[in-house]
């Protein structure tokens, strides 16, 4: 793989010589560094977003990102696709708010749940763009149409699609021209 490519190894050696091999602690303790900030800018640009935030893994980003967003929205209702990854399910558990599970990629069922919810209640729809276990691709535009109609936020896990889909590798949201419609795009630097 790319981890053994001579140019990748050379770039790593160069950066290690200039910057060191680690911060010695997490960002909140040891601070940040210029290459990390630059990488976040590049990732935000890749997805057409205002900003990006790096985590230690895709699992951790879902596990902490979902509950953080939900806790910022008082009385949030999370609507989760039935086949979401365990990291997303764990994030929903940690959010501690009400959740409803919609049948996999079934936008009619999702709409039933949205229609039954209090229109004033904050809602977060979470789903994957490309499901790893069966290769299904989410109907992103249809989900975003429902989010617009019912005033919900959208959170898509692009872990299995980043680097593989879209002209710049931004994932299924980029390929389908939907990145600007999704509120939060979660990805990884390790899968594709």
Q: Residue ranges of each PLM-predicted region?
A:
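Short, structured coil segments at secondary-structure junctions
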Residues: 94-96, 150, 180-181
């Amino acid at each position: 793989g790319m981890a053994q490519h001579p140019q990748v190894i050379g770039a790593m050696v160069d950066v290690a010589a200039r910057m060191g091999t680690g911060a010695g602690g997490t960002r909140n303790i040891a601070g940040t560094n210029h290459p990390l900030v630059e990488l976040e800018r590049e990732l935000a640009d890749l997805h057409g977003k205002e900003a990006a935030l790096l985590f230690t893994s895709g699992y951790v980003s879902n596990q902490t990102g979902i509950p953080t967003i939900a806790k910022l929205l008082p009385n949030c209702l999370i609507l989760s696709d039935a086949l979401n990854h365990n990291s997303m399910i764990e994030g929903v558990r940690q959010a501690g708010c009400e959740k409803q599970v919609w049948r996999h990629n079934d936008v009619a069922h999702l709409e039933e749940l949205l229609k039954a919810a209090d229109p004033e209640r904050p809602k977060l729809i979470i789903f994957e763009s490309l499901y790893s276990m069966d290769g299904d691709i989410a109907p992103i535009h249809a989900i975003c149409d429902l989010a617009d109609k019912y005033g919900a936020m959208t959170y898509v896990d692009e872990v299995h699609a980043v680097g593989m889909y879209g002209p710049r590798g931004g994932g299924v949201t980029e390929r389908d021209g939907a990145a600007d419609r999704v509120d939060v795009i979660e990805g990884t630097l390790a899968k594709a």
